[in-house]
């Protein structure tokens, strides 16, 4: 009996060590990273990789939200410290709307999401959260009034004036330099993602790890912030188990 208790204790220590320093599991609850990550994807995050190397452009990272370190976000690194980011106006004839494309160091960064576009809301309420493996829910809800999404893709006053190299006629920064030790991140679903365009850069110390594989995926219903709690997180897991997406299980997450 004593041997079994010791073995169980060692297993618990090993699991805690792995989760703290090597890998942790998360569930994707929002569409901000579509089509790369879907609602109901269960991912593993490598927490050791950035102890051995620096984050690179294209890496899909989990990080502590700079405005509230208790919140975890997942986004893709678009630019690193020293990079120059510029937004170019582009008229989308298909959707009859002006959008902005992004270039890093003069090279156009292509975003391929073709899903539903949300271009015009008087009040755009954005919800984003990550579910940790233990069922804890990290969530928030932000309402941007009047200014957000009038020009999709635009940077909305997130960049300080000393870093901005160019403003457009509306006073929004459209060209800037990322400071050393910081990262500019965006969601793959550009027009439905709260990211560096709205709240600025991610400090190096906020980065927790790199997403590297979808270990399970299942179709689940979406949740409102009011519905999100540990009980509904368990319910989402049950839904996912009953409605698997076999083609996504075990899918590696390739850097762009």
From Swiss-Prot:
GO molecular function, one term: serine-type endopeptidase activity
InterPro entries, per database record: LexA/Signal_pep-like_sf, Pept_S26A_signal_pept_1, Pept_S26A_signal_pept_1_CS, Pept_S26A_signal_pept_1_Lys-AS, Pept_S26A_signal_pept_1_Ser-AS, Peptidase_S26
Entry's Gene Ontology cellular component terms: membrane
Enzymatic class: hydrolase
GO biological process: signal peptide processing
PROSITE patterns: SPASE_I_1, SPASE_I_2, SPASE_I_3
E.C. number: 3.4.21.89
Catalysed conversion reaction: Cleavage of hydrophobic, N-terminal signal or leader sequences from secreted and periplasmic proteins
Top-level taxon of origin: Bacteria
Active site per database record: 32, 75
Gene3D superfamilies: Umud Fragment, subunit A
Alphabetically ordered keywords of this record: Hydrolase, Protease
Family recorded in the similarity comment: Belongs to the peptidase S26 family.
Name of this chain's protein: Signal peptidase I
